[in-house]
C-alpha cells in the first residue's frame, strides 16, 4: 500500500510538472444555484446595465396572422393552435407553405441597435414545437421548410455580434408537436388558455433529454448569452426539474443568464424575474425584466391594430428603469418575415 501511495504521489508530481490539471468537475460538479453574491453580480452586470432589449416572436403561427379557416381567432396569435383547437397533424402542414423569404436578421438587429436596445431574444421554439434553427434532433424545423438552407438563429446570432448586441434565445418547456405530449381534453373542448398539455406516461425522461440536446445546440452552435424559458406552469414540470436544467445549462456555459421560468417562476428567482405585460411600481430585491407587446399580441396578428405610441413606450421604459428593471419590447414579423411598419 505504501508503494502504491508513493507511486500515486509521484504521478501527481509529474502531472503538475507537465501542466496537466485534473478536472475537478469530474469529481465535484459545480452547484451553480449556490454561487456567491459577488460572482452573481459580476455575471449579471451587463444585463442590469442593459435596461432595454428586443423580443421577437416568430414561427409557423406568423403565417396565419391570427386567422384560421377564414375566421379571426381570439387571444394571442402564437397560441392559435390551442385557441382554434387545431389538431397537431393538421397544424404541422403549415411547414409546407411557411415561406418567410423577407426575414432579414441584419435589419432586425440594426433596428434594435438604433432604438438603443442592448440585447435581443428570439423565439427559437415556441409552444408549437417548430424550431427556427436546423436541429439534428427533429425534422420539424426550418431545414424542412421552403426556406431550407437558411438558419434564422445563426443569422441573428451573427448580426448581433456585428452590432454589439447580446443574443438571447427563448425556448418553451412544452411542445405541442413532440410525441411525448398529448392534449388533455376530451377531444371536443379547446386546450384552454394555459394549455395544460399532458405528458404521456413514461415519456418525460425522453423529452427532457430532447430538450437538453436542443439547448446544448443553442449554446454550442449559436453562442446564446441568455436562455429565456416559458411554460413552466404545466403540472409535470417541477421546481426540481428546473433546478437540474439550470445547473446543466450553466455547466455548458457558466457565464450564461437564465430567466426564472426555467423552474416554477413563483418559487424561483434566478437569474431574473419576468413580469409580463405589467411591471412593479417600486424597486425589487432581485434582478427583473418586464416584457411588453407593442400592440396586444406577441405573434403577428393582422387584425390587431391597438399599437402603443412612442410616448407610451418611452414612459414604460422610464418607469421600469427607474425601479431597477429592464424593458423587453416585442415585435412580431408577419408570415413573409417582414416587420410591421407600426413596430418600426
Task: Give names to the regions the model predicted.
Residues 1-29:
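Bacterial Sec-dependent N-terminal signal peptides
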Amino acid at each position: 500500500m505504501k508503494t502504491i501511495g508513493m507511486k500515486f504521489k509521484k504521478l501527481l508530481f509529474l502531472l503538475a510538472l507537465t501542466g496537466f490539471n485534473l478536472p475537478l468537475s469530474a469529481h465535484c460538479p459545480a452547484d451553480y444555484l449556490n454561487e456567491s453574491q459577488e460572482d452573481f453580480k459580476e455575471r449579471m452586470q451587463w444585463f442590469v446595465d442593459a435596461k432595454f432589449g428586443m423580443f421577437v416572436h416568430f414561427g409557423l403561427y406568423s403565417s396565419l396572422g391570427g386567422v384560421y379557416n377564414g375566421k379571426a381567432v381570439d387571444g394571442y396569435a402564437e397560441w392559435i393552435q390551442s385557441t382554434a383547437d387545431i389538431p397537431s397533424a393538421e397544424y404541422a402542414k403549415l411547414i409546407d407553405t411557411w415561406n418567410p423569404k423577407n426575414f432579414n436578421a441584419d435589419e432586425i438587429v440594426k433596428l434594435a441597435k438604433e432604438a438603443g436596445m442592448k440585447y435581443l431574444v428570439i423565439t427559437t421554439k415556441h409552444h408549437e414545437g417548430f424550431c427556427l434553427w436546423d436541429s439534428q434532433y427533429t425534422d420539424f424545423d426550418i431545414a424542412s421548410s421552403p426556406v431550407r438552407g437558411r438558419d434564422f438563429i445563426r443569422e441573428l446570432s451573427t448580426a448581433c455580434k456585428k452590432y454589439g448586441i447580446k443574443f438571447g434565445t427563448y425556448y418553451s418547456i412544452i411542445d405541442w408537436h413532440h410525441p411525448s405530449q398529448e392534449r388533455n381534453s376530451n377531444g371536443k373542448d379547446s386546450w384552454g388558455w394555459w394549455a395544460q398539455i399532458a405528458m404521456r406516461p413514461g415519456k418525460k425522461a425522453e423529452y427532457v433529454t430532447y430538450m437538453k440536446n436542443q439547448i446544448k445546440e443553442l449554446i454550442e452552435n449559436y453562442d446564446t448569452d441568455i436562455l429565456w424559458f416559458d411554460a413552466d406552469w404545466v403540472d409535470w414540470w417541477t421546481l426540481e426539474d428546473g433546478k437540474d436544467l439550470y445547473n446543466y445549462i450553466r455547466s455548458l456555459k457558466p457565464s450564461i443568464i437564465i430567466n426564472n421560468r426555467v423552474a416554477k417562476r413563483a418559487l424561483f428567482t434566478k437569474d431574473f424575474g419576468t413580469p409580463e405585460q405589467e411591471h412593479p411600481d417600486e424597486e425589487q430585491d432581485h434582478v427583473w425584466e418586464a416584457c411588453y407587446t407593442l400592440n396586444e399580441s406577441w405573434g403577428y396578428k393582422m387584425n390587431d391594430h391597438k399599437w402603443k405610441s412612442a410616448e407610451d413606450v418611452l414612459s414604460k421604459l422610464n418607469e421600469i428603469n427607474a425601479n431597477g428593471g429592464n424593458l423587453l419590447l416585442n415585435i412580431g414579423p408577419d408570415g413573409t418575415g417582414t416587420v410591421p411598419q407600426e413596430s418600426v
